[in-house]
Amino acid sequence: MVLEFIGADREVTGSCHYLTFGDTHVLIDCGMEQGADLYVNQEIPVNPSLIDYVFVTHAHIDHSGLLPLIYNHGFRGTIFATKATTDLCNIMLKDSAHIQEFEAEWKNRKARRAGRPEVTPMYNVEDAQNVMQHFTPCDYNSVYEICPGLKVRFVDAGHLLGSSSIEMWVTEENVTKKIVFSGDIGNHNRPLIKDPQYVDSADYVVMESTYGNRLHDTPPDYAVELAKVINATFTRGGNLVIPAFSVGRTQEMLYFIRRIKTENLLPEHPNFEVYIDSPLAVEATNVFHENISDCFDEEAMELISAGINPIKFPGLRVAVSSDESKMINFDKKPKVIISASGMCEAGRIRHHLKHNLWRSDSTVLFVGYQVPGTLGYALLNGAKKVKLFGEEIEVRASIVNLPGISGHADKNQLTEWLGAIKNKPEHVFIVHGEESTAEYFANHVHETFSYDAVAPYSGDAYDLITNQKVADGSRKRVEKKASYGMASREKTIFDRLVAAGQRLVSVIQKCQGMANKDLSKFADQINALCDKWDR
């Protein structure tokens, strides 16, 4: 009975754990790495065709995004997840496949012009469709006997619709051990979905630590704050454009806007229209509607019992086709437009920015974290001009930040979750956190509970019967590793720009002692360059 750590170890993305007992091979999560990597990750030790079962904690791509890839490489086993996770994976994995195909085509156009070999996408839409045939939906809080020696139960993790912590009872050589995989533990008091459910016993815990070194601020009343932004924008006669992630954040915005309308928080503009312009968000919203009874919290269920849909209201419009999307900007009435992607790197949001950024009466409202190097980050940090579709756009719109509701538990909430376990686990493994955060939280767990706690490296393996480490993973660091997604590519290019700036400073320092005429000429050249790019 051996547990080997594969991904999201001393890093945040690419969650994957490999468990073997007897002749059975199991994966818990199979996520895609996103963004820069710190360490070289251990590959899954066996051919995917030998994997019997995969258990998915939730649908986010950093936990599910490589499922089509292992299917492409021969996996034909069974994937277990909650019904809502299964439904969300059905749309998110296909969307991810479209991105892989798009980026491969983008690279190949450049490769053909340069005479370089073409690349193939990591996986395609057919792989995503085929792997969905291997999903088996599971109910929360039911114990499933998967095979001799393996029982599992999914409990609500409160992170995303359908998210779960997984309790796993594994028996080998007449010894049974209970392993709990936390998944991503949610923040408390979020709209729509339930708070995290606690687990009361475990021999081993594999636990996330995303915010294991910080505490959340007391959140404002988001509906009230959002109403203020809408009112200011509509009073000027402009549009409110909200870049938002299609799954989760879009539905939260709908929840707040429904409150604004039903509680009459915007009496000056009671009948305003709201457009969802993201096919993925429309599909995800339908999934929310289909999983109400399993996943919604008590407050949302009270609304439903009263005949009120918590994410639907008069004036809500959806745009699915590209023609419907284009028509939004022909409507001159002030309106709210919610579109993806949340960091403005791709998707229809870029068209809405093109039509609204130049307007001093419009507002762009950010409701989520913006990665450095993305268009969203540039706008949030005061960019005066941006380029969209080859056209330079002057930024005259108001740029506002409404700090998003965090989807992850903070240090105190993580500690409370672990403290609900009544017995003393043999080992607690801290994963899914930046290296310094994972190490900090492992030390915090040891000091608080006197548990053996460690932040494993990818490739570290433990015998769960003896509680002994049986393999050391690689400690090899990487400076740059292939990553997926436009945001990652943009960040790499931005890093090149920073490096060029550092080189320029070095050259300037070497010029000390040169003739004043040459120094003056050099200064003029630098100032001319700055004038060209200072936006």
Residue ranges of model-derived segments:
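Conserved acidic residues
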Residues: 52, 203, 335, 362, ...
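Hard-cation-handling environments
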Residues: 229-375, 386-387, 422, 437, ...
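C-terminal, active-site-flanking charged/polar segments
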Residues: 359, 434-479
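Generic long, charged, amphipathic alpha-helical segments
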Residues: 387-418
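Short, compositionally biased "basic patch" segments
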Residues: 191-206, 292-299, 370-396
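Charged, amphipathic alpha-helical linkers/stalks
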Residues: 459-521
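His/Asp/Glu-rich metal-coordinating catalytic cores
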Residues: 1-55, 60, 64, 69-252, ...
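Short, surface-exposed amphipathic charged segments that create phosphate/polyanion-binding patches used
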Residues: 150-154, 287-295, 415-416, 465-478
